[in-house]
Swiss-Prot record:
It is found in: Cytoplasm. Its main location: cytoplasm. The keyword Cytoplasm applies. Pathway: Cofactor biosynthesis; (R)-pantothenate biosynthesis; (R)-pantothenate from (R)-pantoate and beta-alanine: step 1/1. SUPFAM superfamilies: Nucleotidylyl transferase (SSF52374). It holds the Pfam family Pantoate_ligase. Homodimer. This is Pantothenate synthetase. Catalyzes the condensation of pantoate with beta-alanine in an ATP-dependent reaction via a pantoyl-adenylate intermediate.
Length: 276
């Protein structure tokens, strides 16, 4: 496994391969990331991963400085997963002095996470565009856990005619249903025990829908009641939305509705979703 830091090194290595799969990460890897790397390797023959904690997608009072980092562990996990090349650029490599170009996606960035994290998706869209430009992947792999992010990425890839296939893989969960996330490491034992309430709220919604409930507001209320049973859970939002436009629904009259939520447990903000 090669480990490189510069754009030039990535481009030089990329020339030897016809097809590559790409998994962009912010490091502190878990089984969800590694499953993407394994899928990338299986489908393309070559897997490239990046590790870059992207400062432009963090707000001024968010956790950029404290975001968990463990490079030696990450590299060992990537090698074991069959990764061929790891790109670990510096902030200066991605955003050199004088950098002043950003990718702004309208519409789908407005609700949900976008409404609560101003500038977040501008940072995501800009860095992913630059990573794609450098790596030139055949396919790029993302997890369904960051549902709005997947919609945003698919939007700009389509709008800007980027020659990459975006593959969305199912959320990988702990045994108790908690979606795997690097930020789960912030939770203490009591908070970790409370965190599966997000998945319980999602499964309550799914069960109600399967039983014939199509009133979106009734399902939102059911989710809020489920979350209210956990004293440590502070609800940011619950959403039942169209999976493409991300606009809230009043009636569920279609397959593939996106049910999502954001909840604070202590100081840690967790997100999760399912498509029903």
């Amino acid at each position: 496994m090669q480990v490189v830091t510069t754009i030039e090194e990535v481009r030089a290595a990329r020339r030897q391969w016809a097809e590559v799969g790409f998994v962009p990460t912010m490091g502190f890897l878990h089984a969800g990331h590694l499953s993407l790397v394994q899928q990338s390797k299986a489908e393309n023959g070559v897997a490239i991963a990046s590790i870059f904690v992207n400062p432009t997608q963090f707000g001024p009072n968010e956790d950029f400085a404290s975001y968990p980092r463990d490079t030696p562990r990450d590299l060992a996990l990537l090698e074991a997963a069959g990764c061929d090349l790891v790109w670990m650029p510096s902030v200066e490599e991605i955003y050199p002095a004088g950098f002043s170009s950003y990718v702004e996606v309208e519409g789908v960035t407005a609700p949900l996470e976008g409404a609560r994290r101003p500038g977040h998706f501008r940072g995501v869209a800009t860095v992913v565009t630059k990573l794609f430009n450098v790596v030139q992947p055949t396919k790029a792999y993302f997890g369904q856990k960051d549902a709005q992010q997947t919609v945003v990425i698919r939007q700009f890839v389509r709008d800007l005619a980027m020659p990459v296939e975006v593959v969305i893989a199912p959320t990988i969960r702990e045994a108790d249903g908690l979606a795997m996330s690097s930020r789960n490491s912030y939770l203490n034992a009591e908070q970790r025990a409370a965190a599966p309430v997000l998945y319980r709220a999602l499964t309550a919604a799914q069960t109600a829908y399967a039983a014939g409930q199509t009133d979106a507001e009734a399902i939102r209320q059911l989710m809020l009641e489920t979350l209210a049973q956990e004293p440590l859970a502070q609800v940011d939002y619950v959403s039942i939305a169209d999976p493409r436009s991300l606009q809230e629904l009043t009636t569920i009259d279609q397959q593939g509705v996106l049910v999502s939520l954001a909840v604070r447990i202590g100081k840690t903000r967790l997100i999760d979703n399912l498509v029903m």
